[in-house]
Design a protein with these regions (language model features):
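Short secondary-structure boundary micro-motifs
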Residues: 93, 100-101, 167-169, 192
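Rossmann-like NAD(P)H-binding beta-loop-alpha module
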Residues: 141-180, 184
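Alpha-helix C-cap/termination motif
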Residues: 21, 89, 165, 198-202
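Residue-level detector of structured alpha->beta connecting loops
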Residues: 91, 115, 167, 203-204
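ATP-binding N-terminal substructure of ATP-dependent carboxylate-amine bond-forming enzymes
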Residues: 1-124, 128-134, 141, 152-161
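Intrinsic-disorder/low-complexity coil detector
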Residues: 47, 61, 75, 166-168, ...
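Conserved ATP-binding module of the ATP-grasp superfamily
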Residues: 146, 169, 181-205
């Protein structure tokens, strides 16, 4: 997802903190898996530095196409080499994933089916919370105060009309994104007219 680097940064921090406290912990890149690990899978939890690299949040979004091309296995699976195998070996999987696939219930459901314990919410809660429109509707139906919102589905041709119809100032966010990626805060209609095209690009729709 566009939050790939945020996930790696979070995972690195968690992994190193656990190792400092005496736990056998490793960082596993969900997409690339253990492609760069050359040891025996049975010994992976003894890997130096827990397979943590120099991961930090970047000021630019990751080039996801470049990431896809970098993986030796060019198959359609979003799970890299030995990811499920090493998860099954662990006592607990700490999910430090952000964004689609990591927070939307899909990886949670996969681990549920495999009987692998993990941290965080289950697949149903994750899926509902990741969709901002669903979350807003649930909060409304439960009488929980939430800021007014508009669920807008549009194409590029709709942008001029939306820029005139939607209230400003406002906050614009893709429906299934997190970590503030893709959030815009236009104060004027001119600024609002520039926002939806970028949101379309980030959301991929």
């Amino acid at each position: 997802s566009t939050e790939r680097q945020v996930s790696l940064t979070s995972g690195t921090g968690v992994c190193r903190a656990l190792r400092q406290r005496g736990h056998q912990a490793i960082l596993v890149d969900m997409f690339l898996g253990l492609e760069s690990y050359t040891g025996r899978l049975a010994d992976v939890f003894d890997a130096p530095d827990g397979l943590c690299g120099d991961n930090r949040v970047l000021s630019t979004e990751p080039d996801l196409e470049a990431v896809r091309r970098s993986r030796r296995d060019q198959g359609p699976s979003l799970l890299g080499k030995d990811v499920l195998a090493v998860c099954a070996m662990a006592d607990l999987v700490f999910l430090a994933l952000h964004g689609s696939c990591g927070e939307d219930g899909r990886i949670q459901a996969t681990l549920d089916l495999l009987g692998v314990p993990y941290t965080g919410s289950g697949y149903l809660g994750s899926g509902m919370a990741m969709d901002k429109s669903v979350t807003k509707r649930i909060m409304d139906s439960a009488g929980i105060p939430t800021a007014p919102w508009h669920d807008v589905r549009y194409t590029r041709e709709d942008i001029p009309r939306l820029a005139q119809e939607l209230p400003v100032p406002c906050a614009v966010k893709i429906i299934n994104g997190g970590s503030s990626i893709g959030v815009e805060l236009p104060d004027t209609r001119e600024e609002l007219a520039q926002v939806p095209a970028g949101a379309l690009s980030t959301a991929g729709t």
